[in-house]
A protein has these predicted regions:
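Peripheral, non-AAA+ core regions of ATP-driven protein-machinery
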Residues: 1-234
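Beta-strand segments within the central parallel beta-sheet cores of soluble alpha/beta enzyme folds
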Residues: 64, 249-251
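Post-Walker A helix-loop "phosphate-sensing" segment adjacent to the P-loop in P-loop NTPases
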Residues: 238-249
Length: 251
């Protein structure tokens, strides 16, 4: 049986969509993984098989081929463990899920089926923000990060067993969080920045910094220790406009 599971890989800080294509068929048992996987991805088979066994399922009695598409993109990291496990369970007929294309899976599995936090969840969440029906399934430790993207459906799970039960029961709608987005009050600085009004003299430096702030220009302060470079630089945020939500997320 053939199954396609949605996930993402990172290229720098950019999230690239990846399809985990799993084909399990009768024949001499074997497992082939293609699609430019790195060492961590190639080793995922052992983690996934052990994690699947821990929840009482078996996916090893088939001739299995896994393709990570696009095939010309190098896949790195252990975040493909969860989508690979779900793909194997579906392709082998161990579980059945309604409309699996709704879900995007990310997560590293331990041998006992527990999910470990991963990197790059925010980049993936920002990519999915315009997909109203998409449900991002991630480790619970990453839910707070993903919830910074407003109105994204996020399902946090702590183990493979919890993920499978939610998918089988189609109970994700009750457990999925509709992300509230940014709360600016939680991002406010906890210290008082100095103000340009408190800086005596140095009119030329202040004027240059005001021009740099207004036009978004770079600047370089050079001078002897104690000349006021650090003080002026610390005053600069006070005259900058507030960042938009998108700018905050990108920073």
């Amino acid at each position: 049986m053939f199954q396609r599971i949605r996930t993402y890989c990172l290229s720098g800080i950019q999230a690239i969509p990846v399809s985990v294509e799993v084909d399990s068929s009768p024949g001499l048992p074997g497992f082939t993984l293609v699609g430019l996987p790195d060492s961590a991805v190639r080793e995922s088979r052992e983690r996934v098989v052990s994690a699947v066994r821990s929840i009482g399922k078996v996916v090893t009695g088939f001739r299995t081929t896994v393709n990570l598409s696009p095939a010309d993109l190098r896949k790195e990291g252990a975040s493909l463990d969860l989508p690979l496990a779900i793909g194997l369970l579906l392709a082998s007929g161990e579980i059945s899920v309604r409309e699996p294309s709704r879900f995007v899976f990310l997560g590293e599995l331990s041998l006992d089926g527990l999910l470990k936090p991963i990197h790059g969840v925010l980049s993936v969440a920002m990519t999915l923000k315009n997909e109203r029906e998409a449900v991002l399934v991630i480790p619970k430790e990453n839910v707070k990060e993903a919830s910074l993207v407003e109105n994204l459906k996020v399902l946090g799970v702590s183990s493979l067993a919890e993920c499978v039960n939610a998918l089988i029961d189609d109970s994700f709608s009750g457990g999925a969080l509709s992300a509230p987005g940014l709360h600016r009050k939680s991002l406010e600085l906890n210290y008082d920045s100095p103000d340009f009004a408190d800086v005596v003299g140095m009119e030329g430096v202040k004027r240059a910094l005001e021009i740099a702030a207004a036009g978004g220009h770079n600047f370089l302060l050079i001078g002897s220790p104690g000349a006021g470079k650090t003080l002026c630089a610390r005053c600069l945020p006070g005259i900058l406009p507030e960042m938009s939500d998108e700018e905050i997320l990108e920073s």
